[in-house]
Amino acid sequence: IRGGNMVGILAFEFEPIKRKSLLKSLKGITQRLCKKNAIDPADIGLMVHTGTYRQNFRQEPAFAAHLQQALDIGCANIGPTSKHTFSFDVSDGACGPHHALETIADLFPVIGCKYALLTAGDCRPNKETPWPHRPISFAAIISEDGPLQILDTRFDYEQENDFTSSTKFNKKYHTEAFTSKPHITK
């Protein structure tokens, strides 16, 4: 087993979106988390958002970039001594949160920041799209040494194949096999 990094949740919160926009909901949650936990938002150097549905089914710009701008994190002029914030989306349906956590764990040592922000949520794509859902928004502040250690990305490359992703959740070894078979439609 080689590589891998441990990350933990320092703080998290979720709420129904209701009539608020996803952006306003996540901005409010993030600000509350930072205030409750005495976290300087400027110490967030990585932002990853995951979700399936976006307004008008748009892919770019990334939702995380909109949230970064709304929170005014790392938006100052860039210079040799300025703090930078890397933000992007991971859209992979139900696997999105899992992949977002793996991405954060892998990028922490490279980016060298104190905290990462993981957000998740969906919004109604447009007024024409049927929307029977009551979506929630979720935000978590992740650190390399949070009290709730949730992900260890060490991987046994001896067992690797094209259909296996291994990770360790809650200190239990967990393997997921992903296969795809063609479906014939008439």
Which ranges hold each PLM region?
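Conserved "HGTGT" condensation-loop signature of ketosynthase/thiolase-family condensing enzymes
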Residues: 1-52, 59, 65-76, 145-186
